[in-house]
């Protein structure tokens, strides 16, 4: 074989040998070293073909082209007469990718990053890319304070030019901050400034979730916090001169030093607005008014810019530019703010689209819109639509996107992107207490029936003391104006004695129809009619019950074996709702007030009225709404009319998961006082405490709850992030610590007549409990767990510390 002349060596190991500019004609091309790559594929990637006249430049381009395919580690081009001999060394193919030692970074995240860099099973191994990944991962660990971390790629050769790739992590420990120093501060102490930082060099003993770990991102955020702190207090010349982060020799400790120049405090001398104000100069001037002598405040300046943008956004100017330039006068320590406004083009809405509503029909979402197609874009109207969709409770998230129409200078599409949640639930409840044992309830509720927005519910309870069934249907848009129509049918067979209440049996059934009228965005009124039939029997001689019967013209006897009574009542039902919550379930901001009431109308056997007021206020204490304070109240009052009393079976009760947790359901408040004569269902000497007068039994006190015609319940709740729950499920799980209190009383109780018994007309007998609750929006419906310990209770109260419900939230 003739001596082969070296034309080009590998770009990694040698440089090209230059031949004459005239070159030579290639009559054949041969490859050596190809395994996985086909000859045809290699030839297609080369700029040289058989019959071409090639020179040094052509050979260099050939090598570059072959390297550019990413298939080769080494390329050599040799000449053997008129034949080009291409010697290659293929990059090995990745057969598998594994990880070891990674605790802070999950495997899935690592795989995603590797694939984004082109490193995946079946692809060629690029050692340069692997080295870059090693360095990038180590830089990540350094940014979170793990300076002793290392990442090494271990490549294990396999047959057929394949390799196993294993990334071995040694994460080490997080460096802890030993000290944070601020140099140059005179107006504020270092402790005061550091108290606003996320990073800490000291953690109080009571802060069980705090730590002193260093993170580069947190330091950057703390520096911005420091800058804002000074700018918000008039220090317009404030500057962070430098920041030093020093590492101890063992890489376990960090010292942070921030050098600052405070400067002097400056006052605002005025605000000058210029530019294209789109005819809204008067409104913009109102937003830029300042108080005389007011200190310069960076946050207020930013808010002013945002307010101007929002104002213009309401009039269709979707992309305004607002820029504030402080003009500092060092002589008199004042700042004049020059605000330049460019409203830009006015935009109109071409279409409103919805994405993600696989179940809910478009019409259900579209009827909540306040922004109209064909009208100019109003940012406030778009936001109202988002709020209304959130309040429906059909969606986990609602996001908006304003998209410019290609080719149109003044049109946009508004896109609402929703993520639907399971609006149907199978409701199942269970509770256990030292007094009550186990109780159950069940039902089915669908708040978005077949995507129409109709609410349909079938609920029932079956236990030792109650058989209850209810069918309800509500059309929230009975008319196009948003008037709702709801109806309900129910049946209830209630055995009060088995529920530890005063003994009676009530079999009732009825129906009601309600119309709802929207007043504005946040207020609505309700009005309707109802009918209920009550069949009472087995009524034991109890003071409050007998008092009601006497008011109805009945004269029951304590010796009667079966006191029974029937009523038919027609009621006018009314209500008012104010709802400004930010979402329909698991709210984090806003308030809700709900007033409901009913009064009997002519034709009824009873004459009474009853009113209930529920309030809930959510106050977020951080920008992300992860920490929220919730205050709830429930007030109730009812009484008779025309000399009659409100029926005892309409009484208010408290205790249980929806009122005062830690107490058995419905057991807070007045207890039954019985007439003991010839009572047949209890033994006064054993079950009850009976008073005597002149050797004869008088009245018997019991622990049977009877409720009252007045109720007050309040709760203070602190909602916190749920530990060990990822952000993906944060909107589905809620943890809270609570303090509940409440009382029920009977305003018609005559304490002077029953001086030897508790004063059940006293509203100050307040019960209290505290505990923890967990709520989860599961596929079955909302699950609620609570554990509460009563710490203020009275004789006869029944505790139920642990309570668990499926399908019930508050």
Curated annotation (Swiss-Prot):
Residues 24-91, 92-172, 175-263, 266-344, 347-421 form the POTRA domain. One of its GO terms (biological process) is protein insertion into membrane. Keywords: Cell outer membrane, Membrane, Repeat, Signal, Transmembrane, Transmembrane beta strand. Its main location: membrane. It comes from the Bacteria. Coiled coil: none annotated. Residues 1-20 form the signal peptide. It is found in: Cell outer membrane. One of its GO terms (cellular component) is Bam protein complex. PROSITE patterns: POTRA (PS51779). Part of the outer membrane protein assembly complex, which is involved in assembly and insertion of beta-barrel proteins into the outer membrane. Constitutes, with BamD, the core component of the assembly machinery. Belongs to the BamA family. NCBIfam families: OM_YaeT, PRK11067.1. Part of the Bam complex, which is composed of the outer membrane protein BamA, and four lipoproteins BamB, BamC, BamD and BamE. PANTHER family: OUTER MEMBRANE PROTEIN ASSEMBLY FACTOR BAMA, SORTING AND ASSEMBLY MACHINERY SAMM50 PROTEIN FAMILY MEMBER. This is Outer membrane protein assembly factor BamA. It comes from Escherichia coli O1:K1 / APEC.
């Amino acid at each position: 074989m003739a001596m082969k002349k070296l034309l080009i060596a590998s770009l990694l190991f040698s440089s090209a040998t230059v031949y004459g500019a005239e070159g030579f004609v290639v009559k054949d091309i041969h490859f050596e070293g190809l395994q996985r790559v086909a000859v045809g594929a290699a030839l297609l990637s080369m700029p040289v073909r058989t019959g071409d006249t090639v020179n040094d430049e052509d050979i260099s381009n050939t090598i570059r082209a072959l390297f550019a395919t990413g298939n080769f580690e080494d390329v050599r081009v040799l000449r053997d007469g008129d034949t080009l001999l291409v010697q290659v060394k293929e990059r090995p193919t990745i057969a598998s990718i594994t990880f070891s030692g990674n605790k802070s970074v999950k495997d899935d995240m690592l795989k995603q990053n590797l694939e984004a860099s082109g490193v995946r099973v079946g692809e060629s191994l690029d050692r340069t890319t692997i080295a870059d990944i090693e360095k990038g991962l180590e830089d990540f660990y350094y940014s979170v304070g793990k300076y002793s971390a290392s990442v090494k790629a271990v490549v294990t050769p396999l047959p057929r030019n394949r390799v196993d790739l294993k990334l071995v992590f040694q994460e080490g420990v997080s460096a802890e901050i030993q000290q944070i120093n601020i140099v140059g501060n005179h107006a504020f102490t270092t402790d005061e400034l550091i108290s606003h930082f996320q990073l800490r060099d000291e953690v109080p003993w009571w802060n069980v979730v705090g730590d002193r770990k260093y993170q580069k991102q947190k330091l950057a955020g703390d520096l911005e916090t420091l800058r804002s702190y000074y700018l918000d207090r008039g220090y317009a010349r404030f500057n962070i001169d430098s920041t030093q982060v020093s590492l101890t020799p063992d890489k376990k400790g960090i010292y942070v030093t921030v050098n600052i120049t405070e400067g002097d405090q400056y006052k605002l001398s005025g605000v000058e607005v210029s530019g294209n104000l789109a005819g809204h100069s008067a409104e913009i001037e109102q937003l830029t008014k300042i108080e005389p002598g007011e200190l310069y405040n960076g946050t207020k300046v930013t808010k002013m810019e945002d307010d101007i943008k929002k104002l213009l956004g309401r009039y269709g100017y979707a992309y305004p530019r607002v820029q504030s330039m402080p003009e500092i006068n060092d002589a008199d320590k004042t700042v004049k703010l020059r605000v330049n406004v460019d409203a830009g083009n006015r935009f109109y809405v071409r279409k409103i689209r919805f994405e993600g509503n696989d179940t809910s029909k478009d019409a259900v979402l579209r009827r909540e819109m306040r922004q109209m197609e064909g009208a100019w874009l109003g940012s406030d109207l778009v936001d109202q639509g988002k709020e209304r969709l959130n309040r429906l409770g059909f969606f986990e998230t609602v996001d908006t996107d304003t998209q410019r129409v290609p080719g149109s200078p003044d049109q946009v599409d508004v896109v609402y992107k929703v993520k639907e949640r399971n609006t149907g639930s199978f409701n199942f409840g269970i509770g256990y207490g030292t007094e009550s044992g186990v109780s159950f309830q069940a039902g089915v509720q669908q708040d978005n029936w077949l995507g129409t927005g109709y609410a349909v519910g079938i609920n029932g309870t079956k236990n030792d003391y109650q058989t209850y069934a209810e069918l309800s249907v509500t059309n929230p848009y009975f008319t196009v104006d948003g008037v709702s129509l709801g109806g309900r049918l129910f049946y209830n067979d209630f055995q009060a004695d088995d529920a530890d209440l005063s003994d009676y049996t009530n079999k009732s059934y009825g129906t009601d129809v309600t119309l709802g009228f929207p007043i504005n965005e946040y207020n609505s009124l309700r009005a309707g009619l109802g009918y209920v039939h009550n069949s009472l029997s087995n009524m034991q001689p109890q003071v409050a019950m007998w008092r009601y019967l006497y008011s109805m013209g009945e004269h029951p006897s304590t010796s009667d074996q079966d006191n029974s009574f029937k009523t038919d009542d027609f009621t006018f039902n009314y209500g008012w709702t104010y709802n400004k919550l930010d979402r329909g379930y698991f709210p984090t901001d806003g308030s809700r007030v709900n007033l409901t009431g009913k009064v009997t109308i002519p034709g009824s056997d009873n004459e009474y009225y009853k009113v209930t007021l529920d309030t809930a206020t959510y106050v977020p204490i951080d920008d992300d709404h992860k920490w929220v304070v919730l205050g709830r109240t429930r007030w109730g009052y009812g009484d008779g009319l025309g000399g009659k009393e409100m029926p005892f079976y309409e009484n208010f009760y408290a205790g249980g998961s929806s009122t005062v947790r830690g107490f058995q359901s419905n057991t807070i408040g007045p207890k039954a006082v019985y007439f003991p004569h010839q009572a047949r269902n209890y033994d006064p000497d054993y079950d009850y405490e009976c008073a005597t007068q002149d050797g004869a039994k008088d009245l018997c006190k019991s622990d049977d709850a009877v409720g009252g015609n007045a109720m007050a319940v309040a709760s203070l709740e602190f909602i916190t992030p749920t530990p060990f729950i990822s952000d993906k499920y944060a909107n589905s799980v809620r943890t809270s610590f609570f303090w509940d209190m409440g009382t029920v009383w009977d305003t018609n109780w005559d304490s002077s007549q029953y001086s030897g018994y508790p004063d059940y007309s006293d509203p100050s007998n307040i019960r209290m409990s505290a505990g923890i609750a967990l709520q989860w929006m599961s596929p079955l419906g909302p699950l609620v767990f609570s554990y509460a310990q009563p710490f203020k209770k009275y004789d006869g109260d029944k505790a139920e510390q642990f309570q668990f419900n499926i399908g019930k939230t508050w």
